[in-house]
Amino acid sequence: MTKGSVFIIMGPPGSGKGTQSQYLANRIGLPHISTGDLLRAIIREGTPNGLKAKAYLDKGAFVPSDFVWEILKEKLQSQACSKGCIIDGFPRTLDQAHLLDSFLMDVHSNYTVIFLEISEDEILKRVCSRFLCPSCSRIYNTSQGHTECPDCHVPLIRRSDDTPEIIKERLTKYQERTAPVIAYYDSLGKLCRVSSENKEDLVFEDILKCIYK
């Protein structure tokens, strides 16, 4: 990665990070890097690291910082990210935020953090009605009426960690570990808050206002 623009999309599970990150990637032409997708990819490959990641995710636990960081850093150093990128799902702890800050300073990249705000009730409603394409990892909602991915033509599946019990546990851990990260970026003047309870297109308009203000 050389000097460029990096956009970090943050928010609790079910806030629409992946959807909005992909909208932004399509609009500004930068690659979308999802740590969740990176982890699910190595899980599908069945590597030792993939099996380790699966054990954490299946019980709703966070994957260790150093483990996630090494996977993400390799992606950030690729040619695809030479002009910048959109990061979704990282950082989740202050340690991760400091690792990413140090890396971005070394390569002289500017960055903006978009924080998607959403209530717990709305999160539970969304997460319990979403399905995943096992091939491309795109998320679909039951209200869309899809039973298979329109692009990959494979049946949609429900993620093993998309249950009310696991989501509530993840939200508790999220508040404990990620709330300080939000405060940290806010103190640096890097944070822009956006409500993600509106329709997807309206949320995206608010994100663009943050970027171009």
From Swiss-Prot:
GO BP terms: AMP salvage
Top-level EC class: transferase
Chief place where the protein resides: cytoplasm
Localization: Cytoplasm
Catalyzed chemical reaction(s): AMP + ATP = 2 ADP
Pathway recorded for this protein: Purine metabolism; AMP biosynthesis via salvage pathway; AMP from ADP: step 1/1
Sequence positions that bind Zn(2+): C133, C136, C149, C152
A Pfam family annotated for this UniProt entry: ADK
GO CC term, one of those recorded: cytoplasm
Keywords: ATP-binding, Cytoplasm, Kinase, Metal-binding, Nucleotide biosynthesis, Nucleotide-binding, Transferase, Zinc
Residues involved in ATP binding: G14, S15, G16, K17, G18, T19, R130, I139, Y140, N198
Functional note: Catalyzes the reversible transfer of the terminal phosphate group between ATP and AMP. Plays an important role in cellular energy homeostasis and in adenine nucleotide metabolism.
Annotated domain remarks: Consists of three domains, a large central CORE domain and two small peripheral domains, NMPbind and LID, which undergo movements during catalysis. The LID domain closes over the site of phosphoryl transfer upon ATP binding. Assembling and dissambling the active center during each catalytic cycle provides an effective means to prevent ATP hydrolysis. Some bacteria have evolved a zinc-coordinating structure that stabilizes the LID domain.
The protein's name: Adenylate kinase
